[in-house]
């Protein structure tokens, strides 16, 4: 039986009042909209018309909304029962673009369906892989998911689009004001203001961006071209194609997305249980199955692949509102907004400093949560090496990606994502260090983790020197 954390205002099964539900849903929808620029870029790159752009964006929103709703379900092993919203998956963008270049939108749709079906298979076998994911490695997954948000959040905060571009002072000022409002409302605002911290920050940020010209003519031009109400264009929606040469790449991206979703769901578990010790793989399996349905549905209806949103999960932690009913509200609202292009357009053109401020704000919670999970069961010398080596090589991939430019063949996919690399290194090192040499009967000394579990798991782990004597 889980124990409710003290700082939680609305727990996973609480049902907020309708006005609260609506405002919390709007907060999550605004964050879910942050990646709607991806289908715009994809369709434009292959020479698609404005109608096609609008149609793919709308269908992507519908797919994400459906995914958010089914994730909040918990029916006979399907769904996680958590507030874990979906957005247009950045993980899938590169390979979806490749598919669109090679075979247009029909090929992108067909390969997206393949990725969704593969994740369904992965969801069914994850329970058999429990031995590979002890708490310290699941914490690492959460930490690396958060780390993946850092480059995007900081670049948006500083107003940098290209590597050599100078920092924009105006952008930083607006972002700093936006995040300051969020922090003040969260730390000193009390329960009610904390619920709406991000919404208050967004309103402040949009206003300042408008005054300073960061929300300018090009944004209004895009909004002016969009109708108020329109059915999504379904031209060619039933056309699907398939290419064997793209299967390996889509499967790798599918696994990476599943690992990210696993980290998000673990974060959901921890936020909702003060006595959390280890992931519930039955629940995670149900969540991954729901995620696979979201990806498959997105491909079937003609949108881009969706993925669970780390920033939305962190938002629920920051506001203290993790009710799955907020997931129903946000998902339904996102589906409805797919039929109102002008309103969804306002959300999809979020000013750079506002997006940066939100990402910096919510990522802070996820980074700390990942560290807490890693340390919660105590650290010994084996865990230190497994986690330390994984983080070192993962960060090297992000900081100096050219180090691995010469790697090709079947190893190459492992070096496409720091999350994937960190997970593989941690799992392999952990299993190697746990292996016993043949003929040596050795019972390891009781670890700090075991002792703490016997005391009820109330202490948060810290590095203990006695562990190094093993």
Feature names for model-found ranges:
Residues 19-35, 167-179, 196, 212, ...:
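Hydrophobic, membrane-embedded alpha-helices of multi-pass small-molecule transporters
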Residues 54-55, 77-91, 131-140, 194-199, ...:
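Short, non-helical or kinked segments that cap or interrupt transmembrane helices
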Residues 9-10, 16-19, 43-79, 249-324:
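Membrane-embedded helical hairpins/re-entrant loop segments and their flanking transmembrane helices
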Residues 1-23, 217-234, 270-286, 432-470:
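Intrinsically disordered, low-complexity non-transmembrane regions of multi-pass membrane transporters
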